[in-house]
């Protein structure tokens, strides 16, 4: 404002100009300055001047990201690429709880429980069992605790209404998530944009009108050829074909966000004042990481950042970033634990012994508690993509000279890499090939926090030791336990084998 000759205060209108280079003034604000109060009527009292800036797309020289960006796009907005079909066609051929995306594009997935459709037909063996007993779940249950009788969610008295993101660990990795009503309950479609594609994980859920989650799926974006399997021979001379990386694996990466600044000049009459709006530079670095899983559950939990005992940055459905650990879920044993884990894929239950009931959650016909090489019958709770399943409890025994736990590196069939923080295990007695198992640590069921990142590796098998404990591979730089036993409440990594 100004005072006139009579001493009265008069409002003076003001406008703003911008100089992104600091010297050249213009009336047009920078494109990244998405909102700004650029003018006002003036007056005796201060007025708010608001500014918002557009989110940056970080700069990365990551080879995996570059390969994904260069890949030929799949599908279109009107005809998304069907992830349950080998060529993206309309027919539902093979389903899973995890779908792998390796290129930008538009995608869809059918509303089917896990692997309940195989080779274009109902796969009832994925949700029923041929064995009986108090520790056998039969049939498998859905979010309501009801036995599943049909592969399609809509065929079990459920009415899908909307789809939404639960979380993702790369910004704008999966967008435009939609529920599309159609036959067999419809499908979910989504977009993976070329500008933001990179290695990452997302969980997408289908909900009913009351906002209850009916089921959810893991979308893993990677350029890794997961079908380039590595054959290993265990101590019992049984062969397994392992995926070359962990489920949901993301390699270490550094993303740089450059500083942005702009001078703003406020002009009122013949006077002016200048300010500088500045968005500071930032660097986000991660080490090798992969999601954690509680035994018997289908949904991934947030990875660590791969560099310490800290959760990797993840984004909620509003795009808000966080490094918070999973929220705690306190459930009863048995079916209550299972159905509540389906309803709450973002929660980590704090029961040290998990459901504390069933032997067959990851192998439908299993009733055995001793370590073995029995065939694993993949279930609708198996987290693996099409063509893969969790390994039997003896799968890792070839990694030591005895087939059992050893506490000396001289008894390990492999070499420890201190730079990569993991074991290169020999895949056979000739030692002509190796397979890498990184020390990705674990997530605690009591604190919900990641631990032992870079020093310990933990990988679930499909088989239980008892109703609350399970076999897993445990590694450190000096010891390896191929059939170690632990409470099923822990969050561990997964190394799938070929189905």
Feature-to-residue mapping (PLM):
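Short, ordered beta-strand-loop transition motifs
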Residues: 178-186, 233-237, 417-419, 429-430, ...
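Extracellular and select intracellular beta-sandwich modules with Ser/Thr-enriched
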Residues: 212-217
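Extracellular/luminal low-complexity segments enriched in Ser/Thr/Pro
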Residues: 183-199
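Conserved, compact domain cores that house catalytic/ligand-binding motifs in diverse enzymes
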Residues: 232-358
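A short beta-strand micro-motif common to beta-rich folds, especially ectodomain repeats
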Residues: 198-209
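Short beta-strand edge segments in extracellular beta-sheet folds
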Residues: 218-227
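C-terminal, surface-exposed recognition/capping segments
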Residues: 333, 339-499
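Solvent-exposed, low-complexity, repeat-rich "mucin-like" stalks and linkers
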Residues: 1-176, 230-270
């Amino acid at each position: 404002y100004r005072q006139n000759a009579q001493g009265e205060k008069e409002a003076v209108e003001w406008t703003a100009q911008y100089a992104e280079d600091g010297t050249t003034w213009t009336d047009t604000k920078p494109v990244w300055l998405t909102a700004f109060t650029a003018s006002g009527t003036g007056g005796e009292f201060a007025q708010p001047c608001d500014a918002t800036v557009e989110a940056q797309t970080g700069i990365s020289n990551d080879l995996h990201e570059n390969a994904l960006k260069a890949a030929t796009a799949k599908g279109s907005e009107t005809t998304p690429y069907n992830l349950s079909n080998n060529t993206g066609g309309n027919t539902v051929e093979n389903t899973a709880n995890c779908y792998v995306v390796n290129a930008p594009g538009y995608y869809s997935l059918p509303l089917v429980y896990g692997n309940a459709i195989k080779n274009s037909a109902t796969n009832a063996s994925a949700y029923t069992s041929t064995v009986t007993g108090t520790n056998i779940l039969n049939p498998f249950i859905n979010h309501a605790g009801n036995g599943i009788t049909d592969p399609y969610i809509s065929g079990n008295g459920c009415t899908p209404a909307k789809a939404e993101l639960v979380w993702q660990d790369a910004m704008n990795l999966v967008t435009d998530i939609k529920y599309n009503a159609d036959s067999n309950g419809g499908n979910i479609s989504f977009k993976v944009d070329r500008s933001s594609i990179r290695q990452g994980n997302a969980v997408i859920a289908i909900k009913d009108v009351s906002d209850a989650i009916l089921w959810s799926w893991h979308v893993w974006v990677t350029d890794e050829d997961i079908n380039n399997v590595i054959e290993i021979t265990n101590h019992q001379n049984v062969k397994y074909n392992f995926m070359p990386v962990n489920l949901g694996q993301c390699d270490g990466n550094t993303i740089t966000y450059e500083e942005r600044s702009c001078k703003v000049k406020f002009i009122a009459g013949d006077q002016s004042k200048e300010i500088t709006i500045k968005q500071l530079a930032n660097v986000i670095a991660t080490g090798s990481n992969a999601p954690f899983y509680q035994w018997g559950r289908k949904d991934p939990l947030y990875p660590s950042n791969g560099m310490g005992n800290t959760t990797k940055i993840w984004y909620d459905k509003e795009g808000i970033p966080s490094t918070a650990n999973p929220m705690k879920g306190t459930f009863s044993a048995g079916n209550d634990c299972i159905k509540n884990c389906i309803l709450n894929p973002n929660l980590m239950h704090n029961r040290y012994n998990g459901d504390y009931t069933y032997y067959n959650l990851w192998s439908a016909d299993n009733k055995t508690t001793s370590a073995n090489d029995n065939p694993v019958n993949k279930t609708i709770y198996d987290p693996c993509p099409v063509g893969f399943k969790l390994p039997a409890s003896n799968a890792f025994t070839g990694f030591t000279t005895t087939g059992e736990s050893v506490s000396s590196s001289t008894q390990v069939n492999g070499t420890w890499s201190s730079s990569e923080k993991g074991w290169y295990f020999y895949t056979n007695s000739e030692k002509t090939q190796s397979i890498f198992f990184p020390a990705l640590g674990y997530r605690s069921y009591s604190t919900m926090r990641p631990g032992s990142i870079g020093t310990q590796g933990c990988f679930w098998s499909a088989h239980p030791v008892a109703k609350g404990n399970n076999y897993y591979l445990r590694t450190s730089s000096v010891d390896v336990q191929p059939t170690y036993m632990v409470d099923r409440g822990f969050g561990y990594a997964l190394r799938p084998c070929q189905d």
